[in-house]
Swiss-Prot record:
Organism: Cicer arietinum
Pfam families: PSII
Entry GO terms, CC: chloroplast thylakoid membrane; photosystem II
UniProt gene name: psbB
Family, similarity comment: Belongs to the PsbB/PsbC family. PsbB subfamily.
Stretches that traverse the bilayer: 21-36, 101-115, 140-156, 203-218, 237-252, 457-472
Tagged with keyword DNA-binding: no
SUPFAM superfamilies cross-referenced by the UniProt entry: Photosystem II antenna protein-like
Biological role stated in the UniProt entry: One of the components of the core complex of photosystem II (PSII). It binds chlorophyll and helps catalyze the primary light-induced photochemical processes of PSII. PSII is a light-driven water:plastoquinone oxidoreductase, using light energy to abstract electrons from H(2)O, generating O(2) and a proton gradient subsequently used for ATP formation.
Membrane topology recorded in Swiss-Prot or TrEMBL: Multi-pass membrane protein
Protein name: Photosystem II CP47 reaction center protein
Length: 509
């Protein structure tokens, strides 16, 4: 046929049977990838330490999505929260993966069947005897079915009425678990961090979809609107479908990058803004302050900080620190976290408590500067010793650890103090195992970063595709020189259906 690669889809332009076939095959590929990727991730996933080596540190991409929908058990006998189980049931991680692969195989067979048996009576227009699709009616059917699915998810799955519920956690990602969620019908339902909004919005959107679907099934579009929007042209469907997809991609890129109830930090890792705003650091200091107010010692107060909370307050878990094109999981970068060393508190020889300035997100190197409680610089690690005034040696800085593995240990040796000051730039200090995975010490992004980058990139591409195909269908007569009202809409030199010599062509006098 001599078609260039970017025009091969014209073979299904006027062939409803094979148009259906290629869409079923596309579903087979998507479901097959999801199931296969899940099995691969389960083969390499280590569930032994959900606190310091959670799924997002290991670079898991599909396991978090299964988990947020209520899957927590494995046929391997482990639970995502670190426990062991004896009866995981059919809907385990492996069960979901297997279901996708079986579904993919059935779709593959269905696609082949529809490719072979493309000329079905259902696609035949009784008036003309030619294959055609009633696109407004199909739109109504799809809208109705999507509405039923959306309503069912919100009313049954999320609420736990007939389903497991969804992953719900506290604002600091410490107590996450799968639980049923009641719909939030008030103003709080519009808060992106309120899980109840997920249930209520799916119920509301599903109801709207069902009503809109019934409307489009029972009411025909006016002729002027039908012709003006080219509702009889399959490329109109392509253009509007691409619009829906790129809009959804932009939305989920935002909810992933900025965080929401749909993207819990326990499953996808913290957001960069939680580092930028000192979100976890403030909560840690609040808890320590509350402990001191209860007459606990500094050591006791810091020892009660959950290791999980301290680990979030580490720059290596910031998704914006990893380069977009650095392959591998976070564990392949700075290593596998083994334990929290404790919180270092620095003091000068006059007894003032000093605070190390933390590294901003987009810096690779940053000067080591220690300030007092008023923000006045009291010590640093100078670049040029000859001009230094505030060096650790000159100021007599010492460090003492509270909580963690080094609880109660203090150092006054300048080299050791400077070592921990440099590490304190990166947040709480952890022992990291770089040997096991041959980690290179260069930060990597989390699945939160990959998901956002991928969806923004494809959303921009699909936005262009929407404009392209929308313009093609709206101005088809201008581009091709063909009147859109002709009975046989044929581009010059082409058959209505490729290889079909019965296509009517306007007689040129």
């Amino acid at each position: 046929m001599g078609l260039p690669w970017y025009r091969v889809h014209t073979v299904v332009l006027n062939d409803p049977g094979r148009l259906l076939s290629v869409h079923i095959m596309h579903t087979a590929l998507v479901a097959g990838w999801a199931g296969s990727m899940a099995l691969y991730e389960l083969a390499v996933f280590d569930p032994s330490d959900p606190v310091l080596d959670p799924m997002w540190r290991q670079g898991m991409f599909v396991i978090p999505f299964m988990t947020r929908l209520g899957i927590t058990n494995s046929w391997g006998g482990w639970n995502i929260t670190g426990g062991t189980i004896t009866n995981p049931g059919i809907w385990s991680y492996e069960g979901v993966a297997g279901a996708h692969i079986v579904f993919s195989g059935l779709c593959f067979l269905a696609a082949i069947w529809h490719w072979v048996y493309w000329d079905l009576e259902i696609f035949c227009d009784e008036r003309t005897g030619k294959p055609s699709l009633d696109l407004p009616k199909i739109f109504g059917i799809h809208l109705f079915l999507a509405g039923v699915g959306c309503f069912g998810f919100g009313a049954f799955h999320v609420t736990g009425l007939f389903g497991p519920g969804i992953w719900v956690s506290d604002p600091y990602g410490l107590t996450g678990r799968v639980q049923s969620v009641n719909p939030a019908w008030g103003v709080d339902g519009f808060d992106p961090f309120v899980p109840g909004g997920i249930a209520s919005h799916h119920i509301a959107a599903g109801t709207l979809g069902i009503l809109a679907g019934l409307f489009h099934l029972s009411v025909r579009p006016p002729q002027r609107l039908y012709k003006g929007l080219r509702m009889g042209n399959i490329e109109t469907v392509l253009s509007s479908s691409i619009a829906a997809v790129f809009f959804a991609a932009f939305v989920v890129a935002g909810t992933m990058w900025y965080g929401s109830a749909t993207t819990p930090i326990e499953l996808f890792g913290p957001t960069r803004y939680q580092w930028d705003q000192g979100y976890f650091q403030q909560e840690i200091y609040r808890r320590v302050g509350a402990g001191l107010a209860e007459n606990q010692s500094l050591s006791e107060a810091w020892s009660k900080i959950p290791e999980k909370l301290a680990f979030y307050d580490y720059i290596g878990n910031n998704p914006a620190k990893g380069g977009l094109f650095r392959a591998g999981s976070m564990d392949n970068g700075d290593g596998i976290a083994v334990g929290w060393l404790g919180h270092p508190i620095f003091r000068d020889k006059e007894g003032r408590e000093l605070f190390v300035r933390r590294m901003p997100t987009f810096f690779e190197t940053f000067p080591v500067v220690l300030v007092d409680g008023d923000g006045i610089v009291r010590a640093d690690v100078p670049f040029r010793r000859a001009e230094s005034k505030y060096s650790v040696e000159q100021v007599g800085v010492t460090v003492e650890f509270y909580g963690g593995e080094l609880n109660g240990v203090s150092y006054s040796d300048p080299a050791t103090v400077k070592k921990y000051a440099r590490r304190a730039q990166l947040g709480e200090i952890f022992e990291l195992d770089r040997a096991t995975l041959k980690s290179d010490g260069v930060f990597r992004s989390s699945p939160r970063g990959w998901f956002t980058f991928g969806h923004v990139s494809f959303a921009l591409l699909f936005f262009f595709g929407h404009i392209w195909h929308g313009a093609r269908t709206l101005f088809r007569d201008v581009f091709a020189g063909i009147d859109p009202d002709l009975d046989a809409q044929v581009e010059f030199g082409a058959f209505q259906k490729l290889g079909d010599p019965s296509t009517k062509k306007p007689v040129v006098s």
